């Protein structure tokens, strides 16, 4: 009875704020679920990325902005809050991605798997400093794993944090680039080539760096599920994530708040 009284006591104050969509990416959306569901189904069926203009046409929407916001909310949902970090041996490097004259440094990590099905992670960086690469690796790779890199000296700090660091080449400073990195780290550079081509096709070279992390999340979701042949499973996974993640207002979608 005490528990029942406590529950009843809070209902009059909170019932107006409680809806089945509260705490999900659908919170405060003016678009009904009967539009969201076909949008998610269409979104997960696109292999080469999705544009707001195409979604607007497919759904018969009157404006571009609602379609644009829907896609970005779905990109937020493509990152599961409790997703597992990479394991085993992991290749790590950096690359500049984005539109012409508006490129951003990005950390890239790919698992080394004999079957070629290693997962990947990407995230924008502010530089090639030890602090930046350390933070990137700690967020995305399990402790104690082997990190395979080129000779960038910034990665030397990883050994102090329980990682086995395996540089594939002699050391060089933060301001330089290893010309043989493509051969030394084939998996990560294959992924970099793929995401560059994908971004060009998705954004037509007009990508605003504020939204780069959001687009990278979409690419990672698709890349890590590239062997899946069941469209329904992708739809189900994204819908699960959409319910599990926090609401995604515009300020969260922009890179001022990392996704």
Q: Where do the language-model regions lie?
A:
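Residue-level recognition of single "structural anchor" positions
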Residues: 1-259
């Amino acid at each position: 009875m005490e528990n029942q009284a406590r529950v009843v006591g809070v209902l009059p104050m909170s019932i107006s704020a409680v809806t089945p969509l509260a705490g999900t990416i659908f919170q405060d959306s003016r678009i009904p679920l009967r539009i969201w569901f076909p949008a998610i189904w269409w979104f997960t069926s696109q292999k080469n990325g999705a544009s707001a203009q195409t979604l607007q046409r497919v759904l018969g929407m009157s404006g571009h902005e609602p379609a644009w916001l829907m896609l970005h909310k779905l990109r937020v949902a493509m990152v599961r809050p409790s997703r597992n970090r990479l394991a085993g041996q992991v290749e790590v490097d950096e690359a500049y991605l984005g539109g012409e004259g508006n490129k951003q440094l990005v950390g890239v990590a790919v698992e080394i798997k004999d079957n070629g099905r290693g997962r990947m992670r990407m995230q924008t960086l502010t530089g090639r400093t030890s602090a930046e690469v350390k933070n990137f690796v700690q967020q995305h790779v399990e402790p104690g794993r082997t990190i395979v890199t080129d000779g960038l000296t910034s990665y030397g700090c990883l050994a102090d944090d329980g990682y086995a660091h395996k540089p594939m080449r002699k050391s060089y400073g933060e301001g330089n680039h290893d010309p043989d990195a493509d051969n030394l780290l084939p998996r990560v550079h294959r992924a970099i080539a793929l995401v560059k081509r994908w971004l060009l096709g998705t954004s037509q070279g007009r990508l605003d760096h504020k939204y780069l992390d959001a687009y990278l999340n979409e690419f990672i979701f698709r890349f890590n599920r590239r062997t899946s042949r069941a469209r329904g499973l992708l739809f189900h996974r994204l819908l699960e994530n959409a319910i599990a993640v926090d609401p995604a207002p515009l300020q969260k979608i922009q890179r001022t708040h990392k996704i």
